Regions:
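Inter-Walker segment of RecA-like/P-loop motor cores
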Residues: 284-336
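Accessory nucleic-acid engagement/destabilization modules that flank
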Residues: 1-197
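SF2 helicase catalytic motif II
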Residues: 328-332, 340-380, 385
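Conserved Walker A/P-loop ATP-binding site and its immediately adjacent core
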Residues: 259-283, 292-295, 394
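Interdomain hinge/linker at the junction between the two RecA-like core domains of SF2 helicases
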Residues: 390-443
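Walker A/P-loop
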Residues: 227-250
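Conserved helicase motor
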Residues: 9-13, 269, 290-304, 453-456, ...
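C-terminal helicase lobe and adjacent C-terminal extensions/tails of nucleic-acid helicase motors
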Residues: 87, 378, 437-445, 451, ...
């Protein structure tokens, strides 16, 4: 047996990789990845120990078609014997996902960490001890900052990320018969030169508004070069150019401090495409990754999705490019996930600049876990965090609780007079309006935007408008369709043609349109101010002629919005100037007070992590920013028809899924069931869902969720 070669992988053409070769390759990568947060030794240990269980005769038979073998528990057991808990957990989950810790008394063989360890301690694993004749495990110490349960759990997930990426990468390099090469992309210095070229046309600025925007941009560039990693706010009024300004800060800091990448986190999928497109124009396609539901390649967590089958997913799963644009859902759910594919990218958040656009949109029921995770990345993983918004939320007390030693700096301090220079609208209140009365008011105006709280209300108001120049926007329209309508809206606004738009809130965040008048259904003050940002956006009309009308609709407010609407009403009733910084601060403070600290962690994520032993799987099951997970239904319309045909033929690729995302609509479970019952859907082999009944989609209002002619099923 001394000359027996224990194998880790075997290709169809007969090439072999020994276990020792794989362990050394994985350990080298894992150590390099973990170096970003000073955990090289932990990475080396996890990499060398993760596949020790493959040193069994049973696993060697598995390579030739034998039954499945638990090869992860052996390495976990050896690391635990060495008192290296983080490495033990990471190894335990490197194929099936991080388990719940459970308790020491768990029955051997149960799915918890202790159940697996107890099985190993009772000698119920296949004999794997041949590894001891080939190498010994390296020594490692757990970083001091990972001493508490909360911080230890976060560190373990980050180490797990390093191990998964290293394991998949080394295996993929062997299976592809090509050495691992980091993603080919430009340096931060080169990206900075491209940014300078992009903004050079803005100088010298013309007009007062552009002068203010350029001043903000220059201040952000200067602050980025001046400050090291930390916690920052960027409070810029709507129209102040905060997207490029925040990017400029991040790039200046990344260049000056040799940071690795910029991650731009956006609340809505509906605006991610346009932001990513701007970044591609600045930096080039090869330097920007757009990551959300429409571009993911779904991969199941079992042996069938081991590294051998992962080439389609590498760039999406690793985030190893300089600029990533993603959604808050993907970002935060990954930070609390337990699956290998979702966690693989996490180590690349270390030494990165994280920009949270529209930070006020962080969902209240998950606010404390979200803020805690940001604080962890800044405190212990060399990241910078920028909370970027035109309506800064009162998050300071929560950050001070979780990161008391880190000051929160405002990147661009705005004196009240400076803020006033961006005032472009006046507000008025209209009380309660029926949908008929509202439509009559809109009909009297040539160009007007109306934003309501639900998709049902948007349809009802839209259908009561008559004549030409009327448009409807909602998330029931696929992105390419919405973009085409927005292009037509902008053209009509520019040419002075009739243009009445009824929309849900999707138009509020970052959509570049400029109306002379806006109606906004009563909502949270942040939403009201976002809607106001679509009125007189370029400052070409006097504020007194640019009216934002706040009204109460005929439907009761959706339960989801009750608290924010209540806080907004308090501010409207008591603050003379609802757009002042004082009113904004009052709103967010009131919003947090109305719910209290417990409502900011409604699913008790942080208490669970403190009281239980590393409950990875339970936390992942609880942490869903969107309470009702949606399913993407693809529309075989326009280019989407050909793309769906490619899916049907099995031609899966990242590019295909990204392009298909432009022809997808997110549908909630109850609506999906209604469409299913009506026979309106087709399910493809890769799990994709396609609308079979094209008659359910109209060019005016998008997807109809009432296929049987019954009551409509709409949500906000």
């Amino acid at each position: 047996m001394d000359t027996y070669a224990y194998l880790a992988h075997l290709t169809e053409d007969g090439r072999t990789q020994t276990i020792l070769e794989h362990l050394k390759g994985t350990a080298s990568l894992c150590s390099a990845f973990a170096a970003a947060f000073d955990a090289e030794a932990q990475g080396q240990l996890a990499g060398m120990a993760h596949d020790i269980g493959k040193y069994s005769a049973a696993f060697q038979r598995r390579l030739h078609g034998g039954p499945k073998v638990d090869h992860a528990s052996a390495g976990a057991f050896e690391c635990l014997k060495a008192q290296q808990l983080a490495a033990a957990f990471a190894i335990s989950g490197h194929h099936g996902g991080l388990p719940d810790g459970g308790g020491r008394g768990d029955a051997a063989g149960t799915g918890t960490f202790w159940g697996r360890i107890n099985r190993a301690s009772q000698g119920r694993l296949e004999d794997y001890h041949a590894w001891q004749s080939e190498f010994s495990l390296p020594h490692a110490n757990t970083p001091a900052f990972a001493g508490t349960r909360l911080e230890g759990m976060f560190f373990t997930r980050m180490l797990f990320s390093c191990l998964v990426d290293a394991d998949y990468t080394d295996t993929g390099a062997f299976m592809d018969n090509s050495p691992y090469l980091p993603a080919s992309s430009s340096s931060m210095e080169e990206l900075w030169r491209r940014l300078e070229t992009y903004v050079s046309g803005w100088f010298p600025p013309k007009g007062a508004l552009n002068m203010q925007r350029c001043a903000i941009l220059e201040q952000c560039m200067s602050a980025g070069a001046q400050y090291g990693p930390g916690l920052f706010t960027l409070t810029v009024p709507t129209g102040g150019g905060k997207t490029v300004a925040s990017l400029s800060f991040a790039l200046a800091q990344a260049k000056a401090r040799r940071m690795k990448r910029i991650v731009y986190v956006i609340p809505y999928t509906s605006i991610i495409e346009q932001t990513a497109q701007v970044f591609r124009e600045i930096f080039g396609d090869e330097n920007v990754l757009e990551f959300h539901f429409g571009v993911q390649f779904d991969q199941q967590e079992d042996d069938a999705s081991s590294p051998e089958t992962a080439p389609l997913t590498r760039s999406v799963e690793t985030w190893d490019v300089p600029v990533i644009v993603t959604t808050a859902v993907q970002f935060f759910e990954s930070l609390y996930a337990c699956q290998p594919s979702k966690c693989r990218k996490l180590h690349n958040l270390a030494q990165s600049v994280l920009i949270f656009d529209e930070a006020q949109m962080l969902p209240l029921p998950y606010l404390r876990p979200c803020v805690w995770a940001i604080a962890q990345l800044v405190r212990h993983y060399g990241a910078s965090a920028v909370l970027c918004t035109a309506t800064q939320p009162a998050l300071d007390p929560i950050f001070q609780e979780f990161a008391p030693e880190i000051p929160i700096r405002e990147i661009c301090p705005m004196a009240e007079a400076h803020w006033e220079s961006f005032r472009r609208v006046s507000f008025q209140q209209a009380g309660t309006l029926s949908w008929m009365d509202l439509a009559a008011r809109l009909q009297q105006q040539e160009q007007v935007l109306c934003v309501v709280n639900t998709r049902r209300a948007a349809r009802e108001v839209f259908h009561q408008l008559s004549g030409s120049g009327n448009f409807h926007l909602s998330t029931l329209m696929y992105p390419a369709h919405r973009r085409r309508i927005l292009d037509e809206i902008r053209r009509r606004l520019r040419d002075g043609l009739p243009c009445r738009v009824v929309s849900t809130s999707l138009i509020e965040a970052g959509v570049d349109v400029d109306f002379p008048a806006v109606y906004r259904e009563l909502s949270g003050l942040d939403s009201i101010l976002q809607a106001a940002g679509r009125c007189n956006r370029e400052g070409k009309r006097p504020p007194e002629d640019s009216i934002v009308t706040i009204f109460q609709g005929e439907d009761p407010p959706p339960r989801l919005f009750e608290t924010s609407i209540g806080a907004g009403k308090i501010v409207l009733d008591h603050c003379q100037d609802v757009s002042s910084r004082a009113a904004i601060h009052t709103y967010f403070s009131t919003l947090l007070d109305l719910k209290g600290a417990e409502a900011q962690d409604a699913h008790h994520i942080l208490p669970l992590m403190e009281s239980e032993f590393f409950p990875f799987r339970t936390v992942a099951e609880r942490f869903h920013l969107i309470e009702s997970p949606t399913t993407t239904v693809y529309l075989p319309l326009e280019e989407g028809a050909g793309l769906v045909e490619l899916l049907r033929s099995g031609q899966y690729s990242r590019t295909l899924y990204r392009r298909l995302g432009q022809y997808g609509v997110s549908v909630y479970p109850q609506h999906l069931a209604a469409l299913e019952q009506a026979g309106a859907l087709e399910h493809l082999e890769d799990g994709s869902v396609v609308l079979r009944d094209i008659g359910l989609y109209t060019q005016t209002t998008g997807l109809t969720l009432e296929p049987s002619g019954g009551n409509a099923l709409f949500i906000g």
